[in-house]
Amino acid sequence: RNQFYLATRSGSEVVDLSRHPEAIHEWGGWSPDGRRVSFSANRQDKSRFDVYIHQVGATEKGDYEGEDRLLCQGPGGYFNAGEFSPDGTKVLVLHYPSNSNQFVHVLDVATGEDRNLTPHEGEVRYLSPKWAPDGKGVYVLTDFHGDFLNLARIDLATGGLTFVERPTWDVEAYEISPGGKWLAASINVDGASKLAAVPLDGGSPIAAEIPTGVVEGMEFSHDGARLVFSFNGPRHNYDVWTWELGRGTKPRQLTHASRAGVPDEAFVEPELVRYDSFDGLKIPAWLYLPPANVRGNRKPPVVVYPHGGPESQSRPTFNSVFAYLLNRGYAIFAPNVRGSSGYGTRFMNKDNVRKRMDRVKDL
């Protein structure tokens, strides 16, 4: 069960903010003035998450004293608090009825008034809501009127939705720079991340040159001039990279995590392939072949690696087990059978209910 703790800057004191160990707590965010915290918890009903505001405070002696206020009772299921608005008067909430259907709500911090910002019928995904820097809109990832998760902005006054970019792939993550000059987005293209920055003043997107792999954990510097992110790939273990925007420079690797003496040539970059399934559906897969000095002229035995989920995806990430098998002479075949994420909603729904065994036939 998730719990929250507040530590002093020196680390000399740690305070339990949750104070309800029997409940699950989901983090929302800090208010702009640093005096309040938004969060969700199932304290009153284990099947329902409600939204709370925690007032952070301390006595003159430095003793911690804070209190929770129930802001809004959830409708049932996941009702997860998010960011405060730039002026601190509102909080975003994501209502999560299912993996393929979400609603974005805006709560008034003073009154608890609840506004559903994305009313709809049927199943539509709305994910990763974030406030626009001016507080007049909300950015969101959605497959509204489309097959892929694309980045859109919802106008708070009118409720109108405008797409920022509509690539034919999922936008998997994004961040907005302080001041609102840049919007950085990571796009899942056939399983590999493509990183781009969009000037919010209307300029053309800028693509970053990065190796084959996956971008995670993006964050802008305080001045908005640099993007910092975590990156890993088949030939790159997890490291921190930085990208200076607007200067025509390439992303630069900042850290160099240890590989325990394993040489670079031991790590293999896979080939993206496709094959026809029983009904003609094209199935994407990553094919890893042993290094040439290990493989020689013989055909290697193959390890087939179907991912779990089922709504998940095999991606070109750093995998020490794969590296071991490859250097022992095994090839690895990692298919993304129907039902996998990353290839659009229709592809993801192709193994639903009675079609579940079709994904097995893909193998």
Regions found by a protein language model. Name each.
Residues G217-L363:
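Serine-hydrolase catalytic core recognition
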